Amino acid sequence: MLLTQFAGRDRKGKAVIKLIVFDKDGVILDLSATWLPVVRAVADYTISRLPPETAGRLGAADLLASIGVDAASGWIDPAGIFAKDSFAVIQSVWQRQLPAGAIELRSDAQYQQKVNALVLQLARGKSHPKGDIKTPLGDLYAAGLRLALLTNDNEASAQQNLSDLGVAQLFSPVVGADSGHGAKPDPHGLLFCCAANGVDVSETIMVGDTMADYMAAKAANVADFICIAEDAAHRPNPAIKPENVIPSLELLPELLRGRGDTILQANAS
């Protein structure tokens, strides 16, 4: 049964889920494997641009700590800036750490060019999936569910990641923090995903791993939020239902089938 043939509401009058909106890093992408080498290199370069007389006052480890990354172990705080925000936000946080009169990160053209070069060198073609993503995403798409991506990364970077992983054709739209709809937890990007697919928020589920994802879902008033976390104890907000916590997308089709309000359940019946 195709989605276009499936009634907008089930027999009990409950809205049928038609759209799944995904966060990217930590959900589709392995955040640590893909982006940790990049942010380490950018932190090192940032320190290299400080005046010689400030040497020793601030190190790359300090910059990383300010965004929730432990330089020694590589541990990433799931509630930290690195896990949930863009490089623009990271640079704003770092700017406040720098000595007075130091480089202006956001406006220095040479700095921005070098950062972009580091991203291209270290990340392009080196996207690492968070487990098997092709099978579950392909199954959901084949069943008729519409898939969209909402990330606080920039749109071009997100498109590149999806292309690297071979799943770009499954997602429409792909919305980044620079796409003109704000950044999460602002709900406008999520609302745009709904509008672009012609579905109501009551027919939409958000899948994410951070407080920003959850707050965007809550603000948009979508039907539900599914959390990617290794354990329910690690979910970003206790209001998230423990039964909605899964360690990876590999378990997402099974979880959706169990809900009884998606096209997957209809196909199984």
Residue ranges of each PLM-predicted region?
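Short phosphate-binding/catalytic loops that engage adenosine nucleotides
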Residues: 103, 140, 145
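Short, low-complexity, disordered segments immediately C-terminal to signal peptides
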Residues: 129, 147-149
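Short, flexible loop segments at the rims of nucleotide/cofactor-binding pockets, characterized by
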Residues: 123-127, 152, 181-182
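Asp-based, Mg2+/Mn2+-dependent phosphohydrolase catalytic module
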Residues: 1-20, 48, 134, 138-141, ...
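Short, contiguous strand/loop micro-motifs
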Residues: 81, 123-124, 145, 177, ...
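N-terminal helical cap/lid subdomain that shapes the substrate entry/recognition surface
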Residues: 15-134
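Conserved phosphate-coupling serine/threonine residues in phosphotransfer and NTP-handling enzymes
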Residues: 27, 151-153
